[in-house]
From Swiss-Prot:
Pathway, per record: Purine metabolism; AMP biosynthesis via de novo pathway; AMP from IMP: step 1/2
Known role: Plays an important role in the de novo pathway of purine nucleotide biosynthesis. Catalyzes the first committed step in the biosynthesis of AMP from IMP.
A Pfam family matched in the record: Adenylsucc_synt
Root EC class: ligase
Cofactor detail note: Binds 1 Mg(2+) ion per subunit.
The name this protein goes by in its record: Adenylosuccinate synthetase
Recorded GO CC terms: cytoplasm
Residues that hold Mg(2+) according to the record: D13, G42
Organism: Methanococcus vannielii (strain ATCC 35089 / DSM 1224 / JCM 13029 / OCM 148 / SB)
Key words, A-Z: Cytoplasm, GTP-binding, Ligase, Magnesium, Metal-binding, Nucleotide-binding, Purine biosynthesis
Active-site residues per Swiss-Prot or TrEMBL entry: D13 (proton acceptor), H43 (proton donor)
Amino acids binding GTP: 12-18, 42-44, 258, 284-286, 324-326
Binding residue positions for substrate: T252, V253, T254, G255, R256, R257, R258
GO MF annotation, one: GTP binding
Length: 338
């Protein structure tokens, strides 16, 4: 039995969706629970060549044997959730998903306020999904909960009980984090942050798990970090330089072009300490060196690719156990047991 949390090590968009999907297929957990803020973060999952952009349903949905759960600490947008469940019908998501009855609910008034507030939309670069205003209402104890929304009734349950029961039964459990550690309301580059903490301890609390139940924390880092929206970015490169390197990307939720930078070893070290990371997953190694594309054996990586992995381990102080070399789940190097 292993309970694993996956956390973003940068400003989101690290490729957590790919890593989570891989682990959910490889480790075959009985339940995959989502922590985090809400539908302000998007994950892209590629299954058999088809891409799925999702914001509410847990990224591990391709594992049709696992229950899917959205923890009480996650804000829920019923419109987004129902739309995703319908879109993912062939994966039988509607019959497997549990929405905690204590989840806060985002309404149209929250989205409208998010988009119309000049400070949030222009200065901070909010995604406009209503999460910040909804969290304000939660703090004021006026927010509607999932149990109050009739269209969610057939999906409701107690996620904390489900996750704890799975652990007690000796099953594997995976907890998905969203966004990235550097967007944390408390530990990120305030005020250019999200409306809540985005670290491993908070993700455990989001799904109702105590800290002693966590076995592994996997921090996910992209070889070239990216950021959407405003805020400091110490190693940022010019857009022209990013184009030359072939690392032009757009946000899953906003569609905005992502800012790109070089790997920041010092920040990565701080993030791993903050999250108690036991493992590191490196994504987009094929962007760092195209010769690494599609490689599934560590020994076959280019010298440049190996040198980068070694540098991460030496400077950050945490072992790299998972390496993504392409968008497909099969394009993954897994050295956790080596």
């Amino acid at each position: 039995m292993t309970c694993t949390i996956i956390v973003g090590g940068q400003w989101g968009d690290e490729g957590k969706g790919k890593v989570i999907s891989y682990l959910c297929k490889k480790d075959n957990p009985s339940i995959i629970a989502r922590g985090g803020v809400g539908p302000n973060a998007g994950h892209t999952v590629e299954v058999d060549g088809e891409k799925y952009g999702i914001r509410m349903v847990p990224t591990g949905f391709p594992n049709v044997n696992a229950k899917l759960a959205v923890g009480a600490g996650v804000l829920t947008d019923p419109e987004v959730l129902v739309r995703e469940i319908e879109k993912l019908q062939k994966f039988n998501v509607g019959e497997r998903i549990i929405i905690d009855y204590r989840c806060g609910v985002i309404e149209s008034k929250h989205r409208d306020l998010d988009k119309s507030n000049e400070h949030l939309s222009k200065e901070i670069g909010s995604t406009g999904t209503g999460c910040g205003p909804a969290n304000v209402d939660r703090a004021m104890r006026t927010l509607k909960l999932a149990k109050d929304v009739s269209e969610l009734s057939k999906y409701l349950g107690d996620v904390s009980e489900a996750v704890n029961n799975a652990i007690e039964s000796g099953d594997n459990v995976i907890i998905e984090g969203t966004q990235g550690s550097l967007l944390s309301l408390y530990y990120g580059s305030y005020p250019y942050v999200t409306s809540k903490d985005t670290n491993a301890a908070s993700f455990a609390a989001d799904v109702g798990l105590g800290p002693t139940k966590i076995d592994e924390v996997v921090a996910v880092f992209k070889s070239y970090p990216t950021r959407v929206g405003e805020g400091p970015f110490p190693t940022e490169m010019s857009l022209e330089e990013a184009e030359k390197l072939g690392v032009v990307e757009y946000g899953t939720v906003t569609g905005r072009r992502r800012r790109v930078g070089y790997f920041d070893f010092e920040l990565a070290k701080k993030v791993c300490k903050l999250n108690g990371a036991t493992q590191i997953a490196i994504t987009c190694l094929d962007k760092y060196d195209p010769l690494c594309y599609g490689i599934i054996d560590y020994n076959e990586l280019s010298e440049k690719g190996k040198a980068f992995i070694k540098e991460v381990e030496e400077k950050v102080g945490v072992r790299v156990t998972i390496i993504s070399t392409g968008p497909e789940l099969s394009q993954t190097i897994d050295i956790r047991n080596k």
